[in-house]
Amino acid sequence: LAIMKKYMDADQKVRIQYESKYAGSANYWKNSMGMNKCIDSIGLIRQKAEYEGKIRNWLATQPKKDASIDVDFNKLEQLYAQNRPLIKVISYWSEAFNRTTEFFTRATNVGTNMPLKGSANNPKAQYVEFADNSDKWNYALDKELTAAMLENYAKVVPAEYHPAFFQTVAKKFGGNFYKYTDWLYKNSKLLKNGEKFYPNDRKKFLKDPGVVVGEELVNVYKAVQTKALQLRGEIKAQEKKLTEAKLQMEMDLPHYSDANFTMRLSYGQVGGYKIGGFNSGYYTTAESIVEKFKQANKVADYKAEPIMMKLLSSNDYGPYADKTSGQLQLCFLTNNDITGGNSGSPMFNGKGELIGLAFDGNWDSLSSGINFDRELARCIGVDIRFVLFMMDKWGHADRLIKEINAK
């Protein structure tokens, strides 16, 4: 993030090129921090351990052995211990090399996921070629980020999971990944437009050091993934028994149905939450976001078009102002559970009227994929009146507003 921001701040063109990628990476980073914070703050690991103890005690009271619930907890612990370092490697590999830079994208795809061009009658003459997307990325940023990712991977991942070319970096470049990357970018043709690569002519194909880097990175990933998948099969077999034991132990309690990828409704109430003596309230206002706009010179995320400051500080909200507070309410909280894929889902009141669109969760809801905390987890929705206000005052979409017959 720091590398991207350095180049983005220095050049408007680079900022536009990388804004979406930067925002996505920053959001994922913040999400991970929030999830870990929630796991710690609510003692989730302790809660899960206590719940496991409850299942173990229940199993000990069962009069006869039932193969469907005969969980081998010792084996499961051993499997988790074996799988944990592999999952870490896969995570670090993905964070470092999966679509982080244009170089890594091309290197890891040139020999595996690219369609071959040329006559099928002459396989050695078949080639792959990358489209010209030079307007989407910056060479200097790409090179520095590539070096940083290689260096970080070398530091945090055990040597047994390093690609073979790391030995070249150690022997010929003194372990300096920045010097190696300079050499790599000068000698590889992966980033040059119009270059053809011939995967079926191995000798010719592997003359490009960028191709070698990509192939060795992919080999590391496949080897680790293969081991992890083998363990995952054994883990699933034990977890299936664990799930069945849970269901039988709680036979009299309601259970969620397996409703993934189906259209469904969830129910909740509008309301805030209290944490550490702080009362969150349940909605935000135009006034609060204007205060953030004023701090834009200190916080980049608070920057907005000048028209936004003008519209939201005018106090002229017309029919979009709340009838009780007289303010333009921007977002509100509910005690619904929100997860990936929910963003943009309509939110209706008890009369079936659209009141907002769900789009996020509060900081304290980020561990809800593991455990939903009824006291703290909240769904954030954008108030439909704010949406209409923006359509009207900023977008001048009068016809759309009339068409939907908004009240």
What are these model-derived regions, one by one?
Residues 1-407:
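Terminal presequence/propeptide segments associated with secretion/organelle targeting
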